[in-house]
Amino acid sequence: MKNLFLIFFFLVFSKAVFALEDVVMKGEAFDKNNKLVYIETHQFKRLISGEITEIKTEYHNAFGKLIAEVSSDFSKDPFIPDTVFVDYRFKEKQELTYDKDSRVISLKFTDMKSGKIKTNEFKRTGNMVSGQGFHNYILKNFDEKKSDIKFIVLPKLDYYSFYFEQETPKAEGERRFVLKISNWVLRAIVKEIAVDYRIKDHSLLSFEGLTNIDSDTHDSQILKIKMSYPGVDNDKKSL
C-alpha cells in the first residue's frame, strides 16, 4: 500500500510540475519622447515554475504592420533556445542551433536579398545565455545579487562577457536586474539593459535598453517596453 501511495504521489507531482500553461504577453515599446515605436506580442508555453519552454513573438509597427518575428525552442537548453529571427523590412534572417551532444552552438546570418550567409560556431560554456533565455536565467537566479554571464548576441554572431546584478528597484514589491558589459571600454558605448519584475509572482513588468529590433533606418535603438498580460488578472501569476 505504501508503494502504491508513493507511485500515485510521484505521478501526480510530476504532472503538476511539468504541466504547461499557454500565456500571451504584450509589450509596447516607446522611445525617449514616449512615442510608440512598435508592439510585440509573445505567445508562449511555460511550466508551473514560470520557466518558458517555447515562445513565438511577433513585432508590429505603430501602424499595425508585421515587421519581424522570432521563435524560440527551449527543449535542449533553458538558457540557449534554438532560435529563428526574421526581419521582414530588411529581408534578414538570424538563426541559432544548439547541438546538445557536442555542446556546439551554431550561429547563422542570412541576407535574403543577396543570398549571402555568415556563420560562426563555438562550444557552450557555463553561464552562457541567449536571447529569450535571459528570462529563464533570471528566474533561476532571482535571489542572486550578482553573477557573470556570457551573453550571445545573435546579430554579431558572437558572445560577450557581461555581469548581471540586482539594483535598487523603482517601486516597492519589485526587483530590478541589470545586464552590463564587463569590458569597461565598451561599457561607455553599450548601454545597460534593465528589467523590472514583480516579486510576488516573478512577472516581467518592463524592459529598458538596447532592443533586438532596429529602427526603420537599420540603426540600433534604446527603448522602454511596458508589459501587459491580456486576459490575465494582475493577481494571477504572469511571466
Residue ranges and their predicted role:
Residues 4-13:
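Sec-dependent N-terminal signal peptides
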Residues 13-19:
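Sec/Tat signal peptide C-region and signal peptidase I cleavage site
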Residues 20-24, 29-79, 85-87, 93-100, ...:
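Acidic, serine/threonine-rich low-complexity disordered tracts
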Residues 65-138:
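Contiguous hydrophobic, core-forming segments of folded domains
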Residues 106-178:
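Solvent-exposed helix/loop surface patches that form functional interfaces
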